[in-house]
């Protein structure tokens, strides 16, 4: 692990001096000042959102990574300290490049470890409730009835998580099949019902057929403008569709009010760069820039005593992708691809705040 931190420290020195980071920071400095009157007017309804360290106003979100993971999966007891230290280092790197808010979409996280992380950093951390894909969920989640599942959502959204006063600010559900399985339909339906009651947004894991997820949530009463669908650009989930056909599906979701979250920056093995640019550009050119969200989707987990960062066991280069990557690499690459500073501000500042408001 010492080698890991040495590598990361070297990267942070490089980032501090790099032209890419300078471009990203220059862009972010042009955003609305946090709490400004301009921000108030832009975001319309202002809400207070719970974070790990108290509530914040949506107008104070600033630069937001809307789909991340501080920790992922079960953390072995003897790996807790190194896991927390690793997460803290990555969050502090994000702070240095101008990121203000991280939305964590690990809905069955160990809140105790998250408290340790939050106590050592200054940016806002919004946590989630809900569930991930079935095979990765414990029996304590998969064996819940629909009413019990809804009760869990309500408790973590209104009272606190695992006996703490820390509340979730968003619901996360996941589909890993198309069509959705009976269990997936149940948790999506439960999420839609609690969302209706509490006016809390929903994020989904949507590699396969996001339109089916969108239609099912809306059928069960969800406000389409408070839904976002993650990983829709992952080509292996397109089911044989061309990028043009997939683009048409995303346009239909956007026309219905839904948002898309793109994260495969630097993941050409899942989404060729030209396809990623095509899909984001298609939404923007058709008047749906306000429906585009971007994030890094970084995570790390333990496998047989080894820390796997992103998918570096198969693609070693992905170890270099951290929260900061969105600013140091993805933003400059988007600018080179022809997106404007206003586009980037929409993806990272305006749209996340409006989505939660």
Q: Model-found features: residue ranges?
A:
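N-terminal secretory signal peptides
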Residues: 1-13
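N-terminal export leaders
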Residues: 10-28
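C-terminal segment of N-terminal export signals and the immediately downstream linker at the start
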Residues: 30-58
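Alpha-helical scaffold segments that flank or form the walls of functional sites
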Residues: 61-66, 71-124, 147-167
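Active-site gating/metal-coordination segments in enzymes
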Residues: 116-119, 125-201, 252, 259, ...
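Short acidic/histidine-rich active-site segments
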Residues: 263-264, 288-312
């Amino acid at each position: 692990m010492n080698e890991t931190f040495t590598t990361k420290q070297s990267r942070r020195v490089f980032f501090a001096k790099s032209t890419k980071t300078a471009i990203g920071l220059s862009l972010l400095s042009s955003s609305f000042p946090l709490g400004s009157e301009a921000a108030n007017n832009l975001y319309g309804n202002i809400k207070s959102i719970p974070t790990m360290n108290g509530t914040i106003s949506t107008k104070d979100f600033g630069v937001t990574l809307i789909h991340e993971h501080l920790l992922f999966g079960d953390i072995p007891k003897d790996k807790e300290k190194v896991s927390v230290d690793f997460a803290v280092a990555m969050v502090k790197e994000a702070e240095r490049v101008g990121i203000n808010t991280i939305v964590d979409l690990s809905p069955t996280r160990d809140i105790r470890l998250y408290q340790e992380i939050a106590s050592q950093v200054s940016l806002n951390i919004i946590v989630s409730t809900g569930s991930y894909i079935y095979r990765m969920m414990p029996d304590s989640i998969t064996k819940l009835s629909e009413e019990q599942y809804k009760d869990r959502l309500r408790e973590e959204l209104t009272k606190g998580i695992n006996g703490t006063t820390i509340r979730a600010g968003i619901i996360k559900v996941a589909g890993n099949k198309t069509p959705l399985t009976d269990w997936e339909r149940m948790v999506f339906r439960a999420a839609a019902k609690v969302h209706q009651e509490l006016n809390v947004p929903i994020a989904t894991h949507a590699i396969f057929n996001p339109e089916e997820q969108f239609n099912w949530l809306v059928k069960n009463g969800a406000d389409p403008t408070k839904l976002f669908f993650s990983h829709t650009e992952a080509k292996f989930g397109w089911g044989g569709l061309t990028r043009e056909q997939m683009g048409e599906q995303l346009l239909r979701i956007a026309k219905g009010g839904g948002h898309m979250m793109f994260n495969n920056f630097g993941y050409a093995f899942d989404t060729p760069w030209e396809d990623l640019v095509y899909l984001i550009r298609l939404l923007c050119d058709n008047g749906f820039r306000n429906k585009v969200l971007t994030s890094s989707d970084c995570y790390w987990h333990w496998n047989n005593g080894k820390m796997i960062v992103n998918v570096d066991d198969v693609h070693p280069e992905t170890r270099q992708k951290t929260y900061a990557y969105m600013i140091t690499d993805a933003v400059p690459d988007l600018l080179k691809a022809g997106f404007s500073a206003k586009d980037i501000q929409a993806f990272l500042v305006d749209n996340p705040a409006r989505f939660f408001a």
